[in-house]
From Swiss-Prot:
One of its GO terms (cellular component) is cytosol. Disulfide bonds: none annotated. Its EC number is 6.5.1.2. It catalyses: NAD(+) + (deoxyribonucleotide)n-3'-hydroxyl + 5'-phospho-(deoxyribonucleotide)m = (deoxyribonucleotide)n+m + AMP + beta-nicotinamide D-nucleotide. It comes from Mycobacterium leprae (strain TN). Residues 607-694 form the BRCT domain. The gene is ligA. The active site is at K123. The keyword DNA damage applies. PROSITE patterns: BRCT, DNA_LIGASE_N1, DNA_LIGASE_N2. Zn(2+) binds at C418, C421, C437, C443. SMART domains: BRCT (SM00292), LIGANc (SM00532). This is DNA ligase.
């Protein structure tokens, strides 16, 4: 069959060809790269046929890179071509102390006075990216590079869920003709961990930290690889812009959000340096409540006119600074891997390392969780490893520095018998990652850990019964199990040197311990349930069980189906609770505690009225009279629920200092907002409470 005779190419034909080519390439990209087609195969075939016919009629349009000449996803490869930014992409100057921050404030006040407002943002530990939109359509994505020229990674950026292909038209902020927006590409911690797991399963080296993995994933030659890695992005600044001029940085973020671009929920506008310092202090304590890595707070002058007056140096804007927290990662030598037996019998490998200073404290040990995790992380004894200590979180080994290996490293071999009691180790069931010691009742290691857990803050919170005290009581056989804790006497404590003073009498610590043990007998039922060391039962599930059933006896009598039906419990926890109560010696512990006077029923304070019953409440910012846990406890105790995000279903948003974008979201959705006084009023009298904000 001969080809149709070639016709002259007119402007309409050329426009039609360009439109068809663009459509076909777009759908090929969605199908082969993003794995997320939006039209059927038949519809795509029809588009491709139309393009093929058009090129047969006009052979000069049929170029080697036409979709009709390429197979499948061919042609979608990132070449990292050097590309100039429309406007220079600066770095930030850093402050590592309060003095350095104050010095920056002093410098800028000398030029712009004291009337400026400050915008505080989380400094995301990721990789910088610049997006360019023309008439609302994404046309280019470029890495920072040297600030003037970066690498074109447009195809890869298009696979990021948060990066819109087209901007949303806003009723408030006009779409710019040209918009160059800057942001940070990163991994959520949970997605980083999942990526490393898959890499190890494929026999590849895992990434040492989320930042490295974000950079590596963004710079893949094959965009399909990037598409299958769950990169995220948050925008934090503007470059070149035509057709819109925000008056403030805060207004710019509101506009970006309206246009469908991702902005942080945790940006806070403050009036003075005291507000800045408060923000820095707050996030130093709460930084690990965010689902991605942060390494500081970025402080910016909010007013754009003042930003222009301050200008920039050769590398950084003078109107912004990054306050950096103490580094949470460090490199050190992995000297050995040894195992520890936990309270539920799980045998956990621990890394023993050359002590190193990280996040303000010295770290020499870190958990490796289980043998599968050791393999997933790819660490060998003798490796130089990257460790992380996140605030109060237990130190963690992130991975090895493979380039520093010298061949002397060796693999860790999991022991086959318990190091505490000699019992053969095994997974509880086939396929489990955790290896356990089945000698639950009498294994010294498990017994020690259970006693320590009973006294922990999340359980009965018995001051004075720390690890050393628990070991001493067991060693002197003052107690033989956690069941004996509530029958402690002065005479029994005198058998341990730890609780005797020089005169041979009971020490002050011993007296305090007896008082605190007695006090723990009246703890709420949920704390008793946590203290029993039932697998999977933490404070949340324990509260739900205590509220629903009201007593240990009722929980014991409930069927697995009844337990699982409780919100916050589910089938896994229900099965664990049912199984725990079938063990004879477990019931012996319950009966010993009951006989000693431990409260086994949920005796609720009748003075606490159910003022929040049926309400779902969000708490954001820092409250003066409540810790975050106290506020949650107060709401739950009154029958309410606590949510982590704002939606139209939320009854109230309680706002403290530095509330961030949850406050803005509440305003946008019309959700009632309460300050701390309003919150107290709600707790006391229940709804309706008139919106109360400062």
């Amino acid at each position: 069959m001969s080809s149709p005779e070639a016709d002259p190419i007119g402007p309409e034909v050329l426009q039609q060809w360009r439109k068809l080519t663009e459509e076909v390439r777009e759908h090929q990209f969605r199908y082969y790269v993003r794995d997320a087609p939006i039209i059927s195969d038949a519809e795509f075939d029809a588009l491709l046929d139309r393009l093929t016919v058009l090129e047969e009629q006009h052979p000069e349009l049929c170029t080697p890179d036409s979709p009709t000449q390429l197979v499948g996803g061919a042609g979608f490869m990132t070449d990292f071509v050097a590309t100039e930014h429309l406007e220079r992409m600066f770095s930030l100057d850093n402050a590592f102390s309060g003095d350095e921050l104050n010095a920056w404030v002093t410098r800028i006040r000398a030029e712009i006075g004291n009337d400026a407002h400050y915008l505080c943002e989380l400094k995301i530990d990721g990789v910088a990216l610049s997006l360019v939109y023309r008439d609302g359509r994404l046309t280019r994505a470029t890495t920072r590079g040297d600030g003037r020229t970066g690498e074109d990674v447009t195809l890869n950026a298009r696979t990021i869920e948060d990066v819109p292909e087209r901007l949303t038209v806003s009723d408030i902020y006009p779409l710019p003709e040209v918009l160059e927006v800057r942001g940070e590409v990163f991994f959520r911690v949970v997605d980083f961990q999942a990526l490393n797991t898959s890499l190890v399963e494929e026999g590849k080296n895992p990434f040492a930290n989320p930042r490295n993995s974000a950079a590596g994933s963004l710079r893949q030659k094959d965009p399909a690889v990037t598409a299958h890695r769950k990169l995220r992005m948050i925008c934090h600044g503007l470059g070149h812009i035509e057709g819109f001029r925000p008056a403030t940085q805060h207004q710019a973020y509101l506009a970006l959000r309206d246009w469908g671009l991702p902005v942080s929920e945790h940006t806070t506008l403050v009036n003075d340096i005291a507000g800045v310092q408060g923000c820095i202090a707050y996030w130093a304590e709460h930084r690990h409540e965010v689902d991605h890595e942060i390494d500081g707070i970025v402080v910016k002058i909010d007013e754009v006119t003042l930003q222009r007056r301050l200008g920039s140096t050769s590398r950084a804007p003078r109107w912004a600074i990054a306050y950096k927290y103490l580094p949470e990662e460090a490199q050190t030598k992995l000297l050995d891997i040894r195992v520890n037996v936990g309270r539920t019998g799980r045998v956990t490998p621990f890394a023993f390392m050359t002590p190193v200073k990280v996040a303000g404290s010295t770290v020499g040990q870190a958990t490796l969780h289980n043998p599968s995790e050791v393999k997933r992380k790819g660490v060998l004894i003798g490796d130089t490893v990257v460790i992380r200590k996140a605030g109060d979180v237990i130190p963690e080994v992130l991975g090895p520095v493979v380039d520093l290996r010298d061949g002397s490293e060796r693999e860790f071999v999991m022991p086959t018998t318990c190091p505490e009691c000699g019992t053969t180790l095994a997974p509880e069931k086939e396929g489990d990652a955790d290896i356990r010691c089945p000698n639950a009742r009498s294994c010294p290691g498990q017994l020690r850990e259970r006693v320590f857990h009973v006294a922990s803050r999340s359980a009965l919170d018995i001051q004075g019964l720390g690890y050393e005290a628990g070991v001493a009581l067991l060693a002197a056989q003052v107690i033989t199990s956690e069941g004996d804790l509530f029958t402690l006497t002065e005479k029994a404590l005198l058998r341990t040197e730890l609780f005797r003073n020089k005169a041979g009498e009971l020490s002050a610590n011993g007296k305090r311990l007896l008082v605190n043990v007695d006090k723990a007998k009246t703890a709420p039922l949920w704390r008793v349930l946590v203290a029993l060391s039932i697998r999977h039962v933490g404070p949340t599930a324990a509260r739900a069980l205590a509220t629903e059933f009201g007593s240990v006896d009722a929980i014991l009598a409930a069927s697995p189906e009844q337990l699982a039906a409780v919100e916050g419990v589910g089938t896994t926890i229900a099965a664990a609770v049912t199984e725990w109560f079938t063990v004879d010696w477990h019931r012996v512990i319950v009966n010993k505690w009951r006989a000693a006077g431990v409260r086994m029923v949920d005796e609720r304070d009748t003075s606490v009225l159910p003022t929040c019953e049926g309400l779902t409440i969000v708490v954001t910012g820092s409250l003066a009279g409540f810790s975050r846990d106290d506020a949650k406890e107060a709401i739950v105790a009154r029958g309410g629920k606590v949510a982590g995000s704002v939606s139209k279903k939320i009854a109230y948003v309680v706002v403290g200092d530095l509330p961030g974008y949850k406050y803005d979201k509440a305003v946008e959705l019309g959700v009632p907002i309460l300050n701390e006084d309003g919150f107290r009023l709600l707790l006391e009298q229940g709804p309706p409470v008139q919106q109360v904000v400062d």
